[in-house]
From Swiss-Prot:
<keyword id="KW-0217">Developmental protein</keyword>
<feature type="region of interest" description="SMAD-interaction domain (SID)">
    <location>
        <begin position="377"/>
        <end position="503"/>
    </location>
</feature>
<dbReference type="InterPro" id="IPR052327">
    <property type="entry name" value="Activin_resp_transcr_regulator"/>
</dbReference>
<keyword id="KW-0539">Nucleus</keyword>
<feature type="region of interest" description="Disordered">
    <location>
        <begin position="55"/>
        <end position="103"/>
    </location>
</feature>
<feature type="region of interest" description="Disordered">
    <location>
        <begin position="307"/>
        <end position="399"/>
    </location>
</feature>
<keyword id="KW-0805">Transcription regulation</keyword>
<keyword id="KW-0238">DNA-binding</keyword>
<feature type="compositionally biased region" description="Low complexity">
    <location>
        <begin position="322"/>
        <end position="339"/>
    </location>
</feature>
<dbReference type="GO" id="GO:0045944">
    <property type="term" value="P:positive regulation of transcription by RNA polymerase II"/>
</dbReference>
<feature type="DNA-binding region" description="Fork-head">
    <location>
        <begin position="110"/>
        <end position="206"/>
    </location>
</feature>
<dbReference type="Pfam" id="PF00250">
    <property type="entry name" value="Forkhead"/>
</dbReference>
<dbReference type="GO" id="GO:0005667">
    <property type="term" value="C:transcription regulator complex"/>
</dbReference>
<feature type="short sequence motif" description="SMAD-interaction motif (SIM)">
    <location>
        <begin position="467"/>
        <end position="488"/>
    </location>
</feature>
<comment type="function">
    <text>Transcriptional activator. Recognizes and binds to the DNA sequence 5'-TGT[GT][GT]ATT-3'. Upon TGF-beta induction, forms a transcriptionally active complex with smad2 and smad4 called activin-responsive factor 1 (ARF1), which binds a site on the mix-B/mix.2 promoter called the activin response element (ARE). Binds to activated smads and the ARE with much lower affinity than fast3. Necessary for the first steps in mesoderm specification, directly inducing mesodermal genes. Acts with fast3 to control the convergent extension movements of gastrulation.</text>
</comment>
<feature type="compositionally biased region" description="Polar residues">
    <location>
        <begin position="375"/>
        <end position="388"/>
    </location>
</feature>
<dbReference type="InterPro" id="IPR001766">
    <property type="entry name" value="Fork_head_dom"/>
</dbReference>
Amino acid sequence: MRDPSSLYAGFPVGSQYESVEPPSLALLSSIYQEQVPAAPGHSYEQCAQPWPPLYREGGTWSPDRGSMHGLSPGTQEGSCTQAEGTKDSLGGDETLSRKSKKKNYHRYAKPPYSYLAMIALVIQNSPEKRLKLSQILKEVSTLFPFFKGDYMGWKDSIRHNLSSNDCFKKVLKDPGKPQAKGNFWTVDVSRIPLDAMKLQNTALTRGGSDYFVQDLAPYILHNYKYEHNVVVYAPHHMPSHASSLPLAEDPHQTNTGGKLNTSFMIDSLLNDLQDVDLPDVPRNIESQRISPAVAINNMWSSAPLLYPQSKPTRNGRGPGFSASHSTYSSSSSSISTISPVGFQETQERSEDLLGRQTQRLGFPTKRPREDDGCSTPSSDTDAGNYSPTEPPKKMPLLSLDLPTSYTKSVAPNVVAPPSVLPFFHFPRFTYYNYGPSPYMTPPYWGFPRPTNPGGDSPRGPQTSLDLDNMLKTVPPNKSVFDVLTSHPGDLVHPSFLGQCLGSSGSPYPSRQGLM
């Protein structure tokens, strides 16, 4: 660890520190004993390290002139190793000698500076302002004794910081061999974060130690000043107005760079939404500021109306409402889009949308609203000036339209059976070998018997399904598939068992066998 007369001493620029005798590490032992562990039986008075002062004649760590020639590695080697060798030669304890051999280096406290600052410090104080990797490692270990000894993990940290920070630039020794080793590294001081050059918050600095320079910027920048109208980390692809902001205007952007102007910012997203046609939202920005009372009362949204098949569907909110939104709203709760009728309606809506593209910028027009089969001109405008407390009127259900969530009367939920025959639990019998069971016959549900009822005798396999007759026998709110699979244990009605399985000579299995 360097003493107060070295780089760690925080003296102002221009001052001179005169020392008759270089202070030893004993002065620092009382401050941070845990950070600088002492070897047993040794005195730090005998291990004084002659560090050159900061502004002494021949010393080179000055902000005005950056040179490292005054710091020779020979003068910075401590005498602790020699003292240990002398004590061992004089017949010291064998246990102590074994411990000293096991730990053959003195572990100093880790310097409270970032690797970026230490690398930039040694590069900027070199004669040519550039160094190789081996030279950087040598100068850092010479300047900070923590990196001496058997600890080698800090070298990987040096390599990582050189390659990951964009302030360090590689200068090829031979441009024809970019992959060759031995290249030089320089530093761009304009891209160094200001916080990276300051004293870091470590356990050593939190202990109240004042023997470290608070800021290494004077020793790295060398009277270089940041331009206040240029952001330090402004990317090259950013617009000019973002990089021309003063650095001191926003305290949060002192070292993190300018504000990113991307498509994910809330301002850009709000600007994009202004050009989107939304339902019940006027395009004027000022008209979007609606009072809370009006917003609460306007709780009824306009529902899509049902129109006859011969007339195309029109938009209910004027040119500001998209026809595609109406198509989505009217078809989201039904399956009419997969039917031929729904396909024709969709095609007619698309043609009507193309015809209305030229009227989007024109004056608002009125449309006739069809209510209960009467086509009367409505007094409402395209902006939808209906009563906010009353729900919109709806068209009655037409025979050609499927029911939706907006219809007042819903037809029975009758659907066609699946194309594949449902699973039958009797593998010995086919689906049509015993004729229609009483469970599926009209008398069981109370319906009138069809004109041509099927006999109870077994039939042969049929080639197709008669959907009309099957749908007539289906009860309300039931489907063919529900009847066949909702109660697997009741597929065979008791009347069927009485008719077909009552006689002992019947070829079919008995009731106990089926159960």
